Amino acid sequence: MQTSNILAKIEAPLFREGIPDFRVGDTVRVHYRIVEGEKERIQVFQGVVLKRHRAGVRSTFTVRKVSFTVGVERMFLLHSPRIDKVEIVSRGVVRRSRLFYLRNLAGKAARVRDAKD
């Protein structure tokens, strides 16, 4: 058996169902499960998707938000069991696959144009 076939069999049950189809530039709300000692809570992180890395079960996406004038970026594993759900707040119109230029912009210049639905 080839290594790719073995990996495919191992990774198959790890894929999550019900993940919305979001793209770079979309504003998303990620509900992330945090375990603190014996307690467990859900933390919501809302921001613009800067990049997506599509690699099967190892897929990731980076979300950026501005909190109290400080930019905060967080990288999430798409198929992680710690992600409770991902909601799409609004669709954005961008012409790039990576939005790293938003890091250098502030205020209204850092906004992404909304898609006309």
From Swiss-Prot:
GO terms for cellular component: cytosolic large ribosomal subunit. It holds the Pfam family Ribosomal_L19. It comes from Sorangium cellulosum (strain So ce56) (Polyangium cellulosum (strain So ce56)). Keywords: Ribonucleoprotein, Ribosomal protein. One of its GO terms (molecular function) is structural constituent of ribosome. One of its GO terms (biological process) is translation. PANTHER family: LARGE RIBOSOMAL SUBUNIT PROTEIN BL19M, RIBOSOMAL PROTEIN L19. Belongs to the bacterial ribosomal protein bL19 family. It comes from the Bacteria. The keyword Metal-binding does not apply. This is Large ribosomal subunit protein bL19. This protein is located at the 30S-50S ribosomal subunit interface and may play a role in the structure and function of the aminoacyl-tRNA binding site.
